[in-house]
Amino acid sequence: GTQDIIKRAGDVFVESGADYFVVDPVMVCKGEDEVLNPGNTEAMIQYLLPKATVVTPNLFEAGQLSGLGKLTSIEDMKKAAQVIYDKGTPHVIIKGGKALDQDKSYDLYYDGQQFYQLTTDMFQQSYNHGAGCTFAAATTAYLANGKSPKEAIIAAKAFVASAIKNGWKMNDFVGPVDHGAYNRIEQINVEVTEV
């Protein structure tokens, strides 16, 4: 079953001896608000969160992992981040995206000591397929290149903001983010504030 695969992923990480483990807890299809497989949530909590260096849920996923349900504010995000941190992940970044504000993109990072709000301008949203996966991959890459978890998360936010801003239309239904935009077109500034 899928829970067995989740458990095996956690085991493989430990067996690998890798320094960092970034978990992107994909639970829903884009545009949906129902968990694909509810048993997977508990498996992620049990087998992945205690082993992860960084976990990168969106608002819906953070609500599921924390058990708090729908998150609608920075305060809700802080509560969820604390609960997820308490489950064993030392670095929690909750991606708020456009859900809290139509003009700004707010994410919340928690390292067990301080909450940080990461803010960028909101860019076009029509062509943003792959943004969440790209964020987790960019965080992983920045960690592998020697950045601290906080530095990696901030750099990944900038990378993805540029990728979203420069996303492109693939067809009438979807368009991906532009993974090369940060290096080729522009680097987006991320405002970091303690909250």
PLM regions with names:
Residues 1, 27-29, 61, 97-100, ...:
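Glycine-rich beta-alpha junction loops
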Residues 1-47, 57:
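Glycine/small-residue-rich loop that forms an oxyanion/phosphate-binding "nest" at active or ligand-binding sites
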Residues 38-115:
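Conserved phosphate/ATP/ADP-binding segment of small-molecule kinases
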Residues 13, 17, 52, 88, ...:
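Structural signal for hydrophobic packing residues in well-ordered secondary-structure cores
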Residues 70-77, 144-154:
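Short, charged, surface-exposed loops that flank catalytic or proteolytic processing sites
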Residues 150-195:
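Charged C-terminal helix
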Residues 115-129:
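Short pre-catalytic strand/loop immediately N-terminal to key active-site residues, enriched for Gly-Thr
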Residues 64, 125-149:
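Short, small-residue alpha-helix embedded
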